[in-house]
From Swiss-Prot:
<dbReference type="GO" id="GO:0008652">
    <property type="term" value="P:amino acid biosynthetic process"/>
</dbReference>
<dbReference type="GO" id="GO:0009423">
    <property type="term" value="P:chorismate biosynthetic process"/>
</dbReference>
<feature type="active site" description="Proton acceptor">
    <location>
        <position position="325"/>
    </location>
</feature>
<comment type="function">
    <text>Catalyzes the transfer of the enolpyruvyl moiety of phosphoenolpyruvate (PEP) to the 5-hydroxyl of shikimate-3-phosphate (S3P) to produce enolpyruvyl shikimate-3-phosphate and inorganic phosphate.</text>
</comment>
<feature type="binding site">
    <location>
        <position position="325"/>
    </location>
    <ligand>
        <name>3-phosphoshikimate</name>
    </ligand>
</feature>
<dbReference type="InterPro" id="IPR023193">
    <property type="entry name" value="EPSP_synthase_CS"/>
</dbReference>
<dbReference type="InterPro" id="IPR013792">
    <property type="entry name" value="RNA3'P_cycl/enolpyr_Trfase_a/b"/>
</dbReference>
<feature type="binding site">
    <location>
        <position position="425"/>
    </location>
    <ligand>
        <name>phosphoenolpyruvate</name>
    </ligand>
</feature>
<keyword id="KW-0028">Amino-acid biosynthesis</keyword>
<comment type="pathway">
    <text>Metabolic intermediate biosynthesis; chorismate biosynthesis; chorismate from D-erythrose 4-phosphate and phosphoenolpyruvate: step 6/7.</text>
</comment>
<dbReference type="Pfam" id="PF00275">
    <property type="entry name" value="EPSP_synthase"/>
</dbReference>
<dbReference type="InterPro" id="IPR006264">
    <property type="entry name" value="EPSP_synthase"/>
</dbReference>
<feature type="binding site">
    <location>
        <position position="30"/>
    </location>
    <ligand>
        <name>3-phosphoshikimate</name>
    </ligand>
</feature>
<feature type="binding site">
    <location>
        <position position="356"/>
    </location>
    <ligand>
        <name>phosphoenolpyruvate</name>
    </ligand>
</feature>
<feature type="binding site">
    <location>
        <position position="25"/>
    </location>
    <ligand>
        <name>3-phosphoshikimate</name>
    </ligand>
</feature>
<feature type="binding site">
    <location>
        <position position="173"/>
    </location>
    <ligand>
        <name>3-phosphoshikimate</name>
    </ligand>
</feature>
<keyword id="KW-0808">Transferase</keyword>
């Protein structure tokens, strides 16, 4: 679908079936970096095949890491604890899950590196991470606007004499980057490596993923609430031998949403009650909206209303600080609520692949919703009866915008998704999987 200018979505009426989820983006790129930094060989299964993971794989190859891809999400990584190549020019696209952690790891190892990305990556802030790394003696220079990529990383005087203090309110990826890289510093230190969080930490479930995976690779992090994180001197990553990547819980949200408005049942496999991903909590949000949710150890199932027959979801007023990615799916579902819906504490949307608050406001309004927004909130009043409007939905080069607005096909309007190929960032065949679950009246938009 890459390069296809638009996709016209047939009117959808019902959704049912089962989906085996692609691997988690958050877990995939963390596991790749951990395997590269660990002593020993790691056999990875279930790795996500997407733009973001390809960016990480390409960067690790440039840095001299031994990689063998066997297809179907299987990759073997030969880790050596440090990157063999000490000088490289890395292009990291718009992959924050690659750019931030690699910046931290390279800064603590030392060498001569240049890190850059697409124009949007150069608009995404990184100053809080750079400031924290400089407290450990890292040498990092901005090659453009201060506080933003591209970056030049040089040889610093690395030491753990004092804690690194990082702001927690902009992106949890800054803390994740520091945590993942901290054992590089701890290996040669005679004192603990300490990270302190200033302000409110957002997206805590993503930090839980990081800590869980670090433990799988032999490094235990001691934490005092969400304020202080300590890695003991001499800590070093060791390969677990083999590791399986869970299905992507953020991607699960779109299919569970289909079950919520298309009757269902829709079951996703690869995540469930035992998942380490915070976005599984989206299922509880659906339950609050009146959707029947059932769980197994590695599956979740949704049975909801038929909006094409007049069914409506319960309106919500929810703090989405912990699950900002899945919150986008909730915003799209607000089109089918029985009253105004409010999404709170979503300020991190402003610095994602696009300004998601502005983008979501713009595109929901095209469909006839009444939308208000602020620095960290959205208020959405569903289109009135007869108030839906045909729309060409801009995706803003944001994979999640494209996937969320596939849900608009259940409304009484013609929906065209522009640049549908942007889903390749995390889910290249999303629209094929979507089509396998949805049934309706193709090419007809009359009630």
């Amino acid at each position: 679908m890459t390069g296809q200018p638009y996709l016209d979505l047939p009117r959808a009426r019902q959704a049912r079936g089962q989906v085996a989820l692609p691997g988690s983006k958050s877990i995939s790129n963390r596991v790749l970096l951990l395997a590269a930094l660990a002593a020993g060989r790691t056999d990875i299964s279930g790795l996500l095949d997407s733009d973001d993971t390809r960016v990480m794989l390409a960067a690790l190859r440039q840095l001299g890491v031994e990689l063998a891809e066997a297809g179907e999400g299987r990759v073997t990584v030969g880790g050596a604890g440090r990157f063999p190549v000490k000088q490289a020019d890395l292009f990291l696209g718009n992959a924050g899950t690659a750019f931030r952690p690699l910046t931290a790891a390279l800064a603590l190892m030392g060498g001569q590196y240049r890190l850059s990305g697409v124009p949007r990556m150069h608009e995404r802030p990184i100053g809080d991470l750079v400031d924290a790394l400089r407290q450990w003696g890292a040498r990092i220079d901005y090659l453009g606007q201060a506080g933003y990529p591209p970056l030049a990383v040089g040889e610093g005087r690395i030491r753990a004499d004092a804690p690194a203090r990082v702001q927690g309110a902009v992106s949890s990826q800054f803390l994740t980057a520091l945590l993942l890289a901290a054992p590089v510093l701890a290996q040669g230190s005679d004192r603990p490596v300490v990270i302190e969080v200033a302000g409110e930490l957002i997206s805590k479930p993503y930090i839980e993923i990081t800590l869980n995976l670090m433990a799988r690779y032999g490094v235990q992090v001691r934490r005092d609430g969400w304020r202080t994180f300590t890695i003991e001197p001499g800590a070093a990553y060791r390969s677990p031998g083999a590791i399986a990547v869970e299905g992507d819980a953020s991607s699960a949200s779109y299919f569970l949403a289909l079950g919520a408005i298309g009757g269902g049942p829709v079951r996703v496999t690869g995540v469930g009650a035992d998942s380490i991903q915070g976005d599984v909590a989206f299922a509880r949000t659906l339950a609050d909206m009146g959707v029947q949710i059932d769980y197994g150890p590695d599956w979740i199932e949704a049975r909801g209303v038929r909006v094409d027959q007049g069914g409506r979801l319960k309106a919500f007023d929810t703090d989405f600080n912990l699950i900002p990615d899945a919150a986008m799916t909730a915003a799209a579902l607000a089109l089918y609520a029985d009253g105004p819906c409010r999404l709170r504490n979503i300020g991190s949307w402003r610095v994602k692949e696009t300004d998601r608050i502005h983008a979501m406001h713009t595109e929901l309004a095209k469909l006839g919703a009444e939308v208000e927004s602020g620095p960290d909130w959205l208020r959405i009043t569903p289109p009135a009866d007869g108030g839906w409007r045909d729309a060409h939905i801009g995706t803003w080069d944001d994979h999640r915008m494209a996937m969320c607005f596939s849900l608009a096909a259940f409304g009484p309007a013609a929906v065209r998704i522009l640049d549908p190929g942007c889903v390749s960032k995390t889910f290249p065949d999303y629209f094929d999987v979507y089509a396998g679950l949805v049934s309706g009246a193709p090419d007809s938009y009359d009630d």
